[in-house]
Amino acid sequence: MESNNVVLLDFWPSSFGMRLRIALALKGIKYEAKEENLSDKSPLLLEMNPVHKKIPILIHNSKAICESLNILEYIDEVWHDKCPLLPSDPYERSQARFWADYIDKKIYSTGRRVWSGKGEDQEEAKKEFIEILKTLEGELGNKTYFGGDNLGFVDVALVPFTSWFYSYETCANFSIEAECPKLVVWAKTCMESESVSKSLPHPHKIYGFVLELKHKLGLA
């Protein structure tokens, strides 16, 4: 189904924005992408998200929806006829939300400490990050995707962060594949979907952004 009047305010390296690019692609929704400069936020961004003043923001029929997991659910509910992301079973749906929330609370903040940290702080962050990934790998088990046989809510919530894996590994000198081989296989399976592969920047491009950011923050 095509949709009219859908705008996504986004920033290309944002894993949270990537989630929505994937979901919109899976659903076949046409939209206008507006790239934001986070050091000089647009009047539209400030108007549409006056509380947090953050991207991503989905604007649908002139109404703003904020916070990426909330937007993911909105997309799934509004365009429910293609590629459902959340399971129909209430218990399974609650579990998908639990793991997506776990990803939100753990991956970004710990990952940031991995690429930006030094010495003991970085080593501690790396240890924590690996434990988080191992917890997620345990939940994945022997399934193809987190929800079973089809790409779903938890996959879309997590897979954008895999575009940052190279940066984490390079900055902190470790191998995610050595620690969590099943998770890396899962990531490669997700990337077989064009909706995923075309929505994620190349890991080397992300690494270039990380180096620029470290320099800007005086961490280089």
UniProtKB/Swiss-Prot annotation:
One Pfam family of this chain: GST_C
Top-level division of the source organism's lineage: Eukaryota
Molecular function GO labels: glutathione transferase activity
Matches recorded under InterPro entries: Glutathione-S-Trfase_C-like (IPR010987), Glutathione-S-Trfase_C_sf (IPR036282), Glutathione_S-Trfase (IPR040079), Glutathione_S-Trfase_N (IPR004045), GST_C (IPR004046), GST_C_Tau (IPR045074), Omega/Tau-like (IPR045073), Thioredoxin-like_sf (IPR036249)
Enzyme class: transferase
Enzyme Commission numbers on file: 2.5.1.18
PROSITE patterns the UniProt entry points to: GST_CTER, GST_NTER
Reactions accelerated catalytically: RX + glutathione = an S-substituted glutathione + a halide anion + H(+)
Chain ranges of the GST N-terminal domain: 4-83
Keywords, comma-separated and alphabetical: Auxin signaling pathway, Transferase
Domain GST C-terminal: 89-209
Any Gene Ontology CC annotation: cytoplasm
Single GO biological process annotation from the record: auxin-activated signaling pathway
Record flagged with keyword Acyltransferase: no
Induction: By auxin.
Sequence positions that bind glutathione: 14, 41, 55, 67-68
Protein family according to the UniProt entry: Belongs to the GST superfamily. HSP26 family.
PANTHER family the record matches: GLUTATHIONE S-TRANSFERASE PARA-RELATED, GLUTATHIONE S-TRANSFERASE, GST, SUPERFAMILY, GST DOMAIN CONTAINING
Name recorded for this polypeptide: Probable glutathione S-transferase parA
Organism annotation: Nicotiana tabacum (Common tobacco)
